[in-house]
């Protein structure tokens, strides 16, 4: 009897130990890719796309992510967990994924560059970073692109995509992103040249923000003026920078009752609606921190002008395009704060 009990336990152990791909996907992936891969902030995992990418590519994409883009890496997932996620995603089509050779395809990168500039640069950009803004599918994207062209210079893509897979996509095309088929337009050797050139692409060095504020959660400047004058100075500087100013609020408003609000702590909220479409196109999650604000506080006999470090905040979104905007916004906000406190 004891023997059969041990045998039963041993047979059941793999069942209990096997990772749940559906649960792992819903926990780690569904927020961006939706529950059945419809896409949203992240790319749609459509039948067309899944028919063109291997299980190995999906697994490596999960493992490496897309540095500087919305797609994070998942180093904490075990190999078994990654495999479970891949199997779950693959189950949506009911078909096995393609298997590609791992051998390098030989070509002339110089000739590939000329072909890339002629056939690919319009959508994928001069440096391979992908023309347009944003990643995945967003409501604000121009409808000419259901999916934005891939960032071919991204290290995550370079590590995940085999030469053979890239060759097939070039030849077959991809309807969902308006990528045409180059079968009959490029010879096999010309495709090899393009692939050789793609392997030379590298991501651009990220633009850095002001070193003085690097790593700090907020910009803080002391004003030589009283609270009321400083508030007006900030508003004038914002108006001069083409920002629309929202009705004034106190910092504690909504957090305590109206009789306890500290009226010596003012929150000045502002936005440039002309740029709002552009920003939400880059990353719709940005809506969680909009509108921008500068706070003016009277504290311990001093008047302080404070704003969140937007360059630092932007890095939390894992989106290089947004990080670039964060640096530009940092320059504008610091200029406004400096003008208000001169």
Language-model features: locations:
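The canonical Cys-X-X-Cys-His
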Residues: 24-35, 85, 89, 112, ...
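Extracytoplasmic electron-transfer domains, predominantly the class I c-type cytochrome c fold
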Residues: 36, 40, 45-93, 138-200
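Electrostatic cytochrome c docking/interface patches
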Residues: 12-24, 91-115, 131
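Terminal, regulation- and interaction-focused segments at domain boundaries
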Residues: 207-246, 338
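Beta-strand/loop substructures that line and gate deep hydrophobic ligand-binding cavities in soluble
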Residues: 293-319
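Sec-dependent N-terminal signal peptides
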Residues: 4-13
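Ser/Thr-rich, low-complexity intrinsically disordered terminal regions
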Residues: 235-292
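Well-ordered alpha/beta subsegment
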Residues: 312, 316-342
